[in-house]
């Protein structure tokens, strides 16, 4: 049995797919994935309620260790047929576009805040219409034509392939984030957990 926790970003996009593929290769293994906020995942790993955690922000905690797991590309998602679709746009163009943002504290939001600050742009300079708590909600808003959003590429891969969402690049921004693996300090890892980490790293590189 493998009990693993993930924050809402990777927990709603990458991890279900990787865990399902791992389970197909190891049909005798029962896998339980719980999805919650980063702090709760870290605390559960520290208390050894979960064997592993996967989070988008490494927050210091003396009961756990963080290690790089994979890089998550953040892109600007736009509705099909949008004027930004499949091209590079300037920050000035972005300022005039209705924007859907992840709520404050979300990993993707922090990445975008940092990138914009480095480019000399403040969020209040943009036309923010909605702030949402889940990447799935932001994806739905784009699908509904309510605006554009910065989102993990992995959250919209299927939509891009289906042609329902397109991707744009923003000149001067190269947003990505490190997704971290969380382990409990001093805990001997099971063979199943070791096998999963090895499989996931090879799958996500």
Where are these regions (language model features)?
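Beta-alpha-beta core module
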Residues: 61-68, 72, 136-185
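Flexible hinge/capping segments at coil-to-helix
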Residues: 61-100, 104, 191
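Central regulatory/effector-binding core of bacterial HTH transcription factors
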Residues: 1-62, 132
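Secondary-structure junction motif
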Residues: 98-120, 189-193, 197
């Amino acid at each position: 049995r493998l009990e693993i926790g993930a924050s809402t970003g990777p927990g709603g996009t990458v991890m279900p797919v990787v865990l399902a593929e791992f389970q197909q290769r190891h049909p005798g293994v029962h896998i339980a994935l719980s999805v919650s906020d980063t702090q709760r995942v870290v605390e559960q790993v520290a208390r050894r309620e979960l064997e592993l955690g996967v989070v988008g922000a490494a927050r210091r905690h003396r009961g756990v260790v963080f290690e790089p797991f994979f890089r998550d590309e953040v892109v600007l998602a736009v509705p099909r047929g949008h004027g930004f679709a499949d091209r590079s746009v300037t920050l000035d163009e972005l300022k005039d576009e209705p924007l859907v943002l992840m709520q404050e504290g979300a990993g993707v939001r922090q990445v975008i805040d940092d990138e914009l600050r480095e480019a000399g742009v403040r969020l209040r300079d943009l036309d923010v219409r909605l702030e949402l708590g889940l990447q799935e909600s932001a994806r739905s808003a784009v699908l509904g034509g309510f605006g554009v959003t910065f989102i993990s590429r992995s959250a919209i891969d299927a939509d891009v392939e289906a042609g329902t969402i397109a991707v744009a690049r923003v000149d001067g921004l190269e947003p990505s984030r490190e997704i971290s693996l969380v382990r409990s300090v001093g805990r001997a890892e099971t063979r199943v957990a070791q096998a999963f980490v090895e499989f996931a790293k090879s799958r996500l590189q």
